[in-house]
């Protein structure tokens, strides 16, 4: 039998009368619980609870502002109702002539005992919060901008006390205040995580019978998860990921968006990412990317990107159909979703043959090639190129698709000329590794000057080597060799890089380029290098036993000797 809820008192004097009635009933129960004749074991447990209640009531009476707290206006009437019900039950258990049903009496006793336990918990929570020692606690007033940490801490404790003890309206108002606090003060999230009961807040995510409370709680948990490392850690450690994934799976559109934000934030910590699989969240995230709103898709694919580096989850992504969903987001998602999807595809493409094959089977390579032409975001382009590079090395078939696409090769050449350093390096790496046709090499010959400039840059690591390999590949075409030596600035840069005193570049790189220029035997190419002063530097590098220098200097010197002998013969 459920205890009835008494009408809240309307004045302090009425509340005092109510407290007196509670004390009177409690005193009676403390004695009668020791003299009952039936269910003695249950009454012994109840006696212990009643003793604790007596202590709590005494503490409330000693609190200077207890009558001002609105929670007591509901708690005390409910408590009196429970005690009065227990008094009636104790009379029945004491009466030797009681002829009622034992099972019914036992059930009523257990229900009243459970109600008393809940009310004890609420009173204990209220006392521990310290709010009964503060004045004007009837109105939950937001601390002002100049409030100190102590005032803010009290506000948060009071807020969570109302949230845990109060009814639905108390909960809604407390959550509304919490959301205002988190929105108005970014730094408050850490204090909320420290002073508030985040575990209870997470419990409200499964508050299905009160959608309004559940929605507000989801917004609050999402804000905490996204605020900073400290509050995010508390949300995860208090078990927030599981309920958030359930909301992402079956909540309303608005709730799914908030849940996706939180899941992305939580999984940003590599130490948390593994748990997605434990909660069965891979399939949930994939479905959110497939059918969610644009906002949900953006954050869900961000979460997938976060977990894609976890070895066990990579295979799960393939098995749950993530690849076609990610490839679709590459062409249909907003800019942020595109960037995250491209990043994830790049990770998967570098993760083994199984995932690379899935990407190729879904025509992922063609979509990536198309994106190189259409996307202006440098970050997204970087991920796309990394994915392309991984796929290009997976099979001869994919390499042929790339090298035979004139449009793609021309776009790569444009990135070498106009992209940032990372894009230039990745593009140069592709040019140097693909078996590009002579026609396509001629089509991008104009990027050779940019490649020479890149050879001078010591950072990022590997840039000089990539630029050199791309140049050597392009210089297998005669017209490109002639075009490069006609570029006086590029020739002078090469000669300066050959100088042993120049330590900004490893000498093998410019030597490889010079060797590629003179390999065709063109007199004009050699003459321009000689006129620019390449020979003495090469000679010195040969003496230093730099790889390739001896052969390169022989080619230059051989041509020079032929010229001398020709002049002597004519004379």
Task: Outline where the language-model segments fall.
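Buried hydrophobic core positions in alpha-solenoid tandem helical repeats
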Residues: 155-160, 200-203, 243-246, 282-286, ...
